[in-house]
Amino acid sequence: MTKKVSVGGKIRSLRESKMMDMEVLAERSQLPVEQIKAIEEDNLLPGLAPLIKIARVLGVRLGTFLDDSQGMGAVVSRNEESKVSVRFTNHSSADNASMIYHSLSEGKENRHIEPFVIDILPTGEQNYAMSSHEGEEFIYVLEGKVEVNYGKQTYLLEKGDSIYYDSIVKHHVHGYGDESARILAIVYAPF
């Protein structure tokens, strides 16, 4: 059984612990105040890029939003055990979650990379809002087909294909056509 993580609640708690108001967080992260508010109230499922920007402003690693436990040493993620699942989207409401992230590093303290298995659900969308953030991403397709818009290029990846790119370039990852896909993604976001 997977456990739900309230990303918005963690962001609000961290922001308040730093005695920072929403307007300051919005300005420093270069995100609209309305978006910060919607994320904190769990009315908007954020994309990965806004989360990385918020994490940098709050002085925490991306993983801080994704799990509760912190451990020293090696962390083993077993297939049969529950994994942290977080739903992300690039859409305007929580009803349109198109990606379900399963953390493979839950509990690892001071990590520098974020490995995920991501279930990508079909959206029917044709126009995608590309985003960028500091860091690098590696994607390996486990099942299905995935389309990656990267800068002005579009790459179609099938099972067994991979792509590695600088995430400062505007990009978007989504399923191809109307089928689901599953990927292994490793995200590095400098702290």
Task: Annotate each predicted stretch with a short phrase.
Residues 9-26:
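Short basic helix-loop element that most often maps to the first helix and adjoining turn
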Residues 31-46:
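Recognition helix of helix-turn-helix/homeodomain-like DNA-binding domains
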Residues 119-121, 132-148:
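Short, conserved beta-strand element in jelly-roll/cupin
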